[in-house]
């Protein structure tokens, strides 16, 4: 079977199912493909096809993730579903599967459970912009008042983690009813209602190209008679020849002008998100720039040394540490293209961190790095990855 060409006629959006174990995330994923397949917007994938998620590696960490794609009238979606709780934690922290929005699945029979909380907190910390709730297994609850109580509880929980609990769409239904065609209203209709809510409520993500220009510097060359060239892959935005840009991180911020953009030995008028380019910098000396700095649109990003983050610490089996660590632990933090040493401060009441834990902590770096919330990094010891993290908020 030859792969169909991916028609980019509709806007694209990345979503995922999150929620407590056995609340029906994978069943819902299967149900969405089933219902949308009837309208020709998907290929039906049964529960066990999705449940056998292949392993992937992201930032040196093995994660099992299932990828499903489907489309509604409005958009094309890539949907991620993870088999185990640990996979969700790793996925959200490493950003292996980017989520522009998430569907929080809560069993109406159980209400919010510990992992429901944890996934909402993680979504908040890693910057998932919007959530939609599917109240699953409603066919198991006869009492309308009980359903309303569960809905209220979910809304209060969302509000307590700074999501707009009163405004978030909550759709009541049953993934199983949709898969077994046993109840039109709770099954088929609820899935369509859910997808309409996902279409309407999860904002269309800004394309990387439309964001302010940023390029991590990978290498620096001096070309006689022309000046200094820095190379790297443009992470976001566009840089045009003749534009003023800033060099940020490690040292004091410098201003310069991009006087040339080269790709595959050809001169271009501009470089854009995804391009591997060489940028010629006016009046910049070879020794003024280094790997680990970034080129960026002036004023769009600032250098910082202290931040709060959410991190996952690898287990011994994953190639991580064999022993716990304590406050004042000093590993390297690998941002984009370089390692910077930093000191970890654990939250009050946390004595130590064990391999396999995920933890919120504060980090103080010895040199400033261009950062904003949502920036991913690896935690390393002597070049070996021992953890992964994401910047939740900047302290200074």
Swiss-Prot record:
- Provide the assembly information: Monomer.
GO cellular component term, pick one? cytosol
Question: Which EC numbers characterise this protein's activity in its record?
Answer: 3.6.5.3
Region G2: start-end pairs: 60-64
Region of interest (G4), ranges: 136-139
Q: What class of enzyme is it?
A: hydrolase
What the entry lists under InterPro entries is as follows:
EF-Tu_GTP-bd (IPR041709), EF-Tu_GTPase (IPR050055), EFTu-like_2 (IPR004161), EFTU_2 (IPR033720), G_TR_CS (IPR031157), P-loop_NTPase (IPR027417), Small_GTP-bd (IPR005225), T_Tr_GTP-bd_dom (IPR000795)
Mind listing the GO molecular function terms for this protein?
Answer: GTP binding; GTPase activity; guanosine tetraphosphate binding; translation elongation factor activity
Every copy of the tr-type G domain together lies at 10-206
Give the gene symbol: tuf2
Coiled-coil spans are: none
What is this protein's name? Elongation factor Tu 2
Reaction it catalyzes: GTP + H2O = GDP + phosphate + H(+)
